Amino acid sequence: MSASTRNKHSKIHGNEKLDISNDEFDRIRDALKNEEFRKLFFDYVDEIQDPENRKIYEEEITQLEKERGVDVTFIHPQPGFVIKTSIDGELKCFINIASCKVVERPNNEVSVNSQTGQKGLSWSIPLAQIPPRDDLDANNKLCKVYDVVFHPDALHLAKRNAQFRQCLIDTALDGVEREYHVNLDRANLKFPKLDYKGMARPSVLRTLSKNPTAEEKEPHPLEHMYPKKPEADAGQSKVLPMKTKVTAVPKFAVPKYCIKHSHDVDMAEYTDELDAKLQVTVPRALVVEIELPLLSSTADCHLDVTEKSVYLLSEKQGAKYKLKVDLPYTVNDKAGNARFDTDHRCLRITLPVVRSTPREERNLHDTVRNLSREDSGVELNSNGESPVEDEELVVELSEHNQENDSNAFPPTAVVSPRSFLKSNLHYLLPAQFNCNILDNVIVFVLHVTNVQPDSVQTLQQARSLHLQFASMGTGYYPTHYAFLMQLPDGVQPELRIDQVEVDTGDENVVLRLTMNEHCMLLPSYLAGTDSNDLKEYPVFGHQNNNNEKETEVEVAEMEKCDLVSEKSLQINMDHNDVEHALEVTIEPQENEAPLDSLELLHEHQQELQQLHHQKKLNKKQRKRNKKQRSLSESACEDLKLAQEHHEQPMDTLKLPHRKQRSYSECNESSLGSSCVQRGILKRFSRYGPHPSISDSCSSIDDCSSTYSCSVDAAGTGFSQSFGSIPEERGGDEAGLSESCKKTVRFNDHIMKQVFRLDSSILGQRKKNQKRRDCKLRAQQRRLSEGDSADYVEVDSTHGSGDQPAHKTAANAQYFKQHNNNHPHVKDNKKQSLHDSGLDLTNGSINNKNNHSNENATKRNEADAKNTMMFEMDDVDEEAQDAANI
């Protein structure tokens, strides 16, 4: 194939280079090396550029065209001004606005605007266009050059009138776009300081000849070989229609862009799992490429990205762009990035696609499965019921809802629990839940941990609420729970649920129900997993599914208390100034059993208290109960004297238990029952008289009593002071036992345990055990000889008295062992000091003369013994706790 053939099919006006072979290139290179060839080549160039030779060339071309009946006119463009723009936003182009006298002059005529009705001038501007040519810009890049030639008068008017100049520019742009089928960027027009771009080249204007010569009319012998000559009047010039509507010039150009779907390779998508190819068609990211050839940087460019669109705006003079692109997928606008390529003038935006969660995919699959079932027209009924029965049930529900339309609260959509709960899942009822009511708000606390917030679903109705949620276990396996709360029928029928709020946390789920009116009197509610598994729960305290029997017993107790309280009782209160006591007498009215109902109620309450208290005993209390200690004889004497004063029967008033000490508690503590008054402290002051073991026992250690007795019980059945410390009494009351007086003292010292970071717990345990042993030995050494002698004397005195044998046997055994270990105590029987070393007996030397002081000294010695035993017990308990740690 020759070079001429290849050049014929090549794109001369495009961006393609000249197609030339290596052989042809070598021949041209060798020829240019020859000096004679170069001389001939330069002579040819000079001959072409010579004006005289060009004139001769034009005359010859005119003569040849005239022989064919065509008039030829050469147009020589004269420089005017240059317009710079781009073609399709890609290629830079220049339009030369030139002048030539050959082109007709512009003319005008008066016309009326059809839209506004105003008169004006309608201009007709002739023009001539020269075919485009390729050229290079200042950066040696390829560009296009178009020449549009007007009459010189048109350019003169454009210089004098700005409106005519704009009209001239629009006419030139319209001619180029119409003739060469290109799109020019009119929003970014520039006017460089040039008169003409490139080298001016003449163009030819051809018209049909009207007056042929006689020689031309003679037939030519070879005329039949050529096509017939066109006649002058045969054809008419093509008249382009005038624009009736002026198109608005856009202020901004729309750049070219493309959207690419980016998808990385995930080996999990090539498995045989059912959900392996769910996200195959969804890309990982979207790449938006925008071509901006007129921008050298993005400093003056504004870019906004949302989840579904990309907005670009550039207001730079000469580079005005505006673009809005709608994205096919939802993207994460916070994690995207943009980069501008200065070499290719391209802006590349990468946006990651937001994929659906597994839960949304499961919901989509359920929806598709339900739609497929509806389309098939056949539904499987697992219970074997006919569709007619289901339709009847639906009709009955709808009729029931129509009856409730008269109420102020419209019924919600009828959704059966079977459709609310998924049949392929097993739902559990929360093991523990609380119910609290305040005004018109009911709060349920479901004790379930690690609840997934997105799994919570509610179904609200007028008098019921259905809740389902899932909890993630330790093995990352979900456990599904369901909770249906329903108000009982017949209880406050006007009560409705207005609003539901569900709050999930790490430890529990809080369900808040706002009712339409006050609901503090609501006695109970129904709860379960569904409507077939509902149980009634009373509205008070903490409800546990495992202690339903205890709840029933407490409800029965409350009912019995209500029956007794409904009976009319007669209460008489007498104040005795001599004994400083208040006597309360409770008698039923006539025709009623005076004591049967009260005694039966009292016995029933004691049984419940014992049963309830035995369940709450911890290891420490059980261990203390196992160690039985004998009562000191001094304390037994005082208790016996106090018991003789109250042998007469007295009725009691039973009031409900409260957290603070009430009137009924102190009154019941003074009755002649089997329970003994107890103290509220385990440890006592080192510098005061210590109570005996029987008085120092806390109320919580006694299974048959639930009251604290930190009050004055000085020989009376009732005390008027509940919180104050009793004062010392004299006179007739000096003989009463001081051990029955309870004194409360508090220590400012705070016990704390500190563990070092670099030591082990076992090491600390051994050190603490050694410290406690040393402290115990020091406390045992503090017992004086007088204390031991007094113990022996007390043993000999009370052993021969009227005390029972089982009360003194333990004391005698202890004193006997103590005397064997300390033989020197017999010499100092009169000395009685406290374990701290202070004399608290106030004159122990005169014990034989003062009988009351002697009794006080004996009681102090017994209290010191009991205190030592309590401290030993506490040391054992602390050692046990340290071993557990």
Curated annotation (Swiss-Prot):
Which terms does the UniProt entry file under GO BP? axonemal dynein complex assembly; cilium-dependent cell motility
Identify the GO cellular component terms for this protein: cytoplasm
Q: Does the keyword Cytoplasm apply?
A: yes
Q: Where is this region: Disordered?
A: 208-235, 371-390, 607-636, 644-663, 781-806, 819-871
Q: Where in the cell is it found?
A: Cytoplasm
Coarse class of the primary localization is: cytoplasm
A GO molecular function assigned to this protein is: protein phosphatase 1 binding
Keyword annotations of the record: Cytoplasm, Phosphoprotein
Comp. bias (Basic and acidic residues): 213-232, 824-837
Residue stretches of biased makeup (Low complexity) = 842-855
Q: Which residues are recorded as modified (Phosphoserine)?
A: S376, S784
Q: Where is the composition biased (Basic residues)?
A: 612-629
**Keyword presence, DNA damage:** no
Physiological role: Required for cytoplasmic pre-assembly of axonemal dyneins, thereby playing a central role in motility in cilia and flagella. Involved in pre-assembly of dynein arm complexes in the cytoplasm before intraflagellar transport loads them for the ciliary compartment.
The text of the family note is: Belongs to the PIH1 family. Kintoun subfamily.
Subunit organization: Interacts with Pp1alpha-96A, Pp1-87B, Pp1-13C and flw.
Official protein name in the record: Protein kintoun
Designated gene of the protein: Nop17l
